[in-house]
């Protein structure tokens, strides 16, 4: 399930949760996410955008997964922005990819697949120079 996905992702990535909601969801998220995951609540769209910019200024590559139009600025600012949608016709136009909400548990698989694709592209480019 989701807890297993986040445990797997935690091994290779820093997970941070930015939410526009209040802290009423803290206990639910803490039960679902790996221990030590940074949770930041009551975030306005501008604050999410600034948070992403600050991470990038620290030299980090940022992938953001968002579910609403209020995430558009942060999705556009991130190195990779993924919009989660239950209806693929309703999504943020600022994203790089759209992921059907029912497929969210496959996020790690898609990330591995994209890394393999990048490796293939780099190898093909190198071979084309020979």
PLM regions and their residue ranges:
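Conserved ATP-binding TGD loop and adjacent catalytic N/P-domain core of P-type ATPases
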Residues: 1-123
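Bilayer-spanning, highly hydrophobic alpha-helical transmembrane segments
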Residues: 122-130
